[in-house]
Amino acid sequence: MFLGLTATLPMLATRRTGARADEGTPLHPGPGHVGPTNLITDVTGLTVGEAHDARSRTGVTVILPDQRVACAVDVRGGGPGTRETDALTAGNLVRSVDAIVLSGGSVYGLGSADGVAAWLGARGRGFSMTKQPGVPPSPIVPTAILFDLANGGDKHWGLNPPYRDLALKAMDHPSRRVTLGTAGAGYGAQAGALKGGLGSASFVTADGLTVGALVAVNSLGSVVVPGTRHFWAGPFEIGREFGGLGASAAHVDPEDWGRAKLNPAARANTTIACIATDADIDADDLKRVAMMAQDGLARAIRPVHSPFDGDVIFALSTGHHSLPPGPRPLHVARLGALAADVLARAVARGVYEANLPPGMDGPTWKSLPG
């Protein structure tokens, strides 16, 4: 399998002697561009549903493929909260999903998957070992949650947390439009000391592959360089999608975390995300893409993957676009590298677009001086 890759890479290296002399090769087929809407839904076959509860300051986001799709997950945070991620492990029977849920609410938010599963099951969607009258399918709805319980919202819900109902509301009108910032799973999120939010971005390669990301940013770490308004993700910005400040020239003290959260608590922080592509790759390939996409969090948040975070990344493929000619591992590497860059941009966009919900205090990125 690796002979073709070994033979290809030296050839590419010999051709990379001038400015973009490698264009037209499998490594760099030519300049790509941001997708039409710069959202995860630029990936063919996806819609997104969102809902929030302003009183509780929490929300739910659902990524809905038009059919079951291959999926993988990579968990890096020290305090994750997930549902059905084991189903995506190599060697297991079901490595495809009917939907992905990102939710606020910590452990209570895992109940949002109940609403999505009910919605899907009522429409006959799900995994079926047998098709018999009266035997419903089992929708596969992996879910990741973030902690927004201490943001000042009213969490006195007793025996009836709102997440199942929020999920059903999100499924009322799934759309290709995605509200960024204070919306969905990012409604009550906090990114370090700044208001966090829901972010998305996309990229289309010259040979037609699309990669998109959707992320709820609720990190311990800071998304900006200490003492500045510059996003850590600045070098990866395309156009002015999150302010246009670009990279910072500031020297960074290794022990200065800048606008990180003070006095972090275990499982009180988390960045949860979904990567999507239309490239026709399988669950094993998607596992590598999810792993590589974690680099995007490291590019956009400092620190990240701490004992206090529950960082989780799903990666799915709608399979609408065949891989171009060339070694498959090379294309997987390309997709993983793109996923990391797109996710870094999505993180910054989520915080850039965030505003304070009614009654909530604290700084937003737009309120920073300078």
Q: Predicted segments — roles?
A:
Residues 1-21:
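N-terminal export signals
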Residues 24-107, 111, 122-370:
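A structural signal for small-residue-enriched, beta-sheet-centric alpha/beta enzyme cores
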Residues 114:
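Glycine-rich loop at the start of a catalytic domain that most often binds anionic cofactors/ligands
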Residues 117-120:
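Active-site-surrounding "flap" and adjacent substrate/cofactor-binding loops of secreted or lumenal enzymes
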